[in-house]
From Swiss-Prot:
InterPro entries: Znf_RING, Znf_RING/FYVE/PHD. This is Putative zinc finger protein ORF121. One of its GO terms (molecular function) is zinc ion binding. A zinc finger (RING-type) spans 53-105. It comes from the Viruses. It comes from Ostreid herpesvirus 1 (isolate France) (OsHV-1). Keywords: Metal-binding, Zinc, Zinc-finger.
Amino acid sequence: MVKSRNTTTAHVHDVPRIMGGIKKLKLTKETAMAAGRKLKTLLAKVDAVEKVCVICMEPTYTKKTLAECDIEGGALRVTTMPCPTHYICDNCIRQEMEDKCPICRKDWPERRIIYGNEAKLYKYWLIDNDDIMILENNNDIDELTPEEEDHLLSDDESDNYVPRYTLDSLVEEVLSERSQMSNDRLMNDMIDNIAVNNAIDDDCIIIDDYIDLTI
C-alpha cells in the first residue's frame, strides 16, 4: 500500500453476504460517474507511483488515484488492491481462488459502511446492467440460510431501504473522523464501514468501499 501523506486509499474485495431487507434501485451511468469524480477529488489524491505485482513481478505505472472507480454492471465500484500490504495486479487477483492474500495469507477485507452514529452492514449485489440490489440489516447482523436467502431475493417490494448518506455528508464524516484520530491510529486502523447513497432525482448511486485513512 502506498503510504503517501494526506492519502485516502480504498480497498475492495467482492465478498457478498446476505443481510436483512432488500430494495432495487435504478442507477444511470452519468450519475454514478459524476459522484465517483467528486468522491475521488475530495478523498483520494495520490502522486504517480510505480507498483510491482508480488506474484508476476510486472510493474504498473499509473497517475490515477488508488481509489479509482469504474462502472461495472451499472454500479460504481472501487477496483484497487484488497490486501493493504502486498500489491497484486488485477490479472493475478482474478486467478486467486481463495479469499486470502497469497503472500501474507490474511483474509481479504469485507465491505462495510457507517451511517448515522452506528456502524452497521450494507451489502449490494449487481442484478443486471441498470439495477442494484441493496441488502440491509438494521438490527443484529445475521447470515441467512439458503431458504431465507431465496425468500428474500424474491421480495422485490420491500421498503426496508432508506438512504443514510448524501455524498457531501459522507465526505464531511470521513474528514471529521480523520481529524479526530491520532497519526498512529490512522496508520493502523481502518474506517471500514463506509458507503455513499446519493439520490439525484429518481436515481440513487451506491458506492461501497473499504477505506484506509492513511496520512
